[in-house]
């Protein structure tokens, strides 16, 4: 038995060392989670306006179009649980913060990194949970899988490692103010039919199922919005709940009931808190095809600039 265990250990040790080395090398690769943390911790003294939310904000609102000292801290796939946690952690380290622009996607009120079975073919976002734990020191559990990028993301990690170390391509496309340029117009699908044909599937993936879990998450996320509103209210910070624009084919085919419930939740928060305002651009017809990367994301170098200028006029016109 001892000989067997010794043999197992002998063969396992190289694999363990290889895994540790691979994990270490993964953590040296630039990523938006680490960079957004850098902005919060190293530029916190300067931040007057911050943009939060998921990819619709991270790719779609250009902070350079807004007043001085605006930073885009939104991250793709960041839902309300982490929006709230990020603010709770950092808001008292941002002494000059006056405004928060919160970009809210069509599916956001029903989304949670820890949940599955709410959308068509969705799953628990273990990789994002791990990224928050490792790179932003924000965690809601003590699971080992969420302490390792390799264990949580698997194939995605191998692809990222290959992209950085073998192909020498960018793995992080944020500019100095935090805008993520992954969705620049030059990166968009050139065949118009292909990106238009992808919109119906996107809508299907973004439409919540009619079940008890979806309703529970919806109610939880409303409470998270109220918690963020209170956090801002107690510190004299204005909160702007912004619904970004979507392409015509997208907004004409979404579930009207879900859309109205999204509006209802946002209005509820805006009506309760005197520091909160809501802005709806969901069906804004000022945006054309080149402004969009896909059905519900603006191009980072074209649409995000236009949207940033519109927000400057609407929010900061005084």
Residue ranges with predicted function:
Residues 6-24:
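Hydrophobic membrane-insertion alpha-helices, especially the h-region
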Residues 26-46:
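Alpha-helical transmembrane signal-anchor/signal-peptide segments
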Residues 31, 257, 261-318:
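C-terminal regions of proteins
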Residues 48-50, 99, 238:
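Structural motif
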Residues 49-53, 298:
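Short hydrophobic beta-strand that contains or immediately precedes a catalytic carboxylate
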Residues 56-145:
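Membrane-embedded segments
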Residues 113, 117-235:
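Secreted/periplasmic serine-hydrolase-like ester/acetyl group-modifying domain
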Residues 229-254:
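Active-site segments of SGNH/GDSL-like serine hydrolases
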């Amino acid at each position: 038995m001892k000989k067997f265990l010794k043999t197992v250990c002998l063969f396992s040790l190289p694999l363990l060392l290889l895994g540790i080395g691979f994990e270490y090398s993964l953590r040296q690769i630039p990523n938006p989670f680490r960079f957004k943390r850098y902005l919060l911790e190293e530029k916190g003294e300067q931040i007057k306006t911050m943009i939060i939310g998921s990819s619709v904000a991270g790719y779609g609102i250009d902070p350079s179009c807004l007043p001085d000292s605006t930073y885009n801290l939104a991250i793709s796939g960041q839902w309300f649980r982490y929006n709230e946690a990020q603010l709770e952690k950092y808001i008292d380290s941002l002494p000059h913060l006056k405004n928060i622009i919160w970009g809210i996607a069509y599916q956001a009120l029903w989304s949670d990194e820890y949940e599955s079975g709410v959308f068509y073919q969705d799953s628990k976002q273990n990789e994002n949970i791990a990224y928050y734990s490792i790179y932003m020191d924000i965690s809601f559990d003590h699971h080992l899988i969420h302490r390792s990028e390799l264990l949580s993301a698997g194939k995605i990690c191998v692809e990222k490692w290959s992209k950085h170390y073998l192909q020498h391509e960018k793995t992080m496309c944020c500019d100095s103010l935090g805008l993520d340029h992954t969705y620049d117009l030059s990166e968009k699908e050139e065949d118009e039919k292909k990106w238009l044909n992808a919109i119906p599937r996107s809508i299907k993936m973004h439409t919540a199922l009619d079940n008890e879990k979806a309703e529970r998450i919806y109610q939880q996320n409303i409470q998270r919005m109220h918690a963020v509103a209170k956090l801002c209210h107690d510190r004299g910070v204005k909160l702007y709940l912004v619904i970004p624009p979507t392409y015509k084919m997208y907004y004409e085919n979404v579930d009207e009931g879900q859309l109205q419930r999204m509006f209802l939740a946002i209005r509820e928060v805006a009506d309760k808190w005197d520091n909160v305002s809501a802005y709806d651009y969901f069906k804004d017809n000022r945006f054309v095809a080149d402004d969009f990367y896909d059905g519900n994301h603006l191009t980072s170098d074209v649409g995000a600039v236009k949207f940033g200028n519109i927000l400057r006029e609407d929010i900061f016109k005084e």
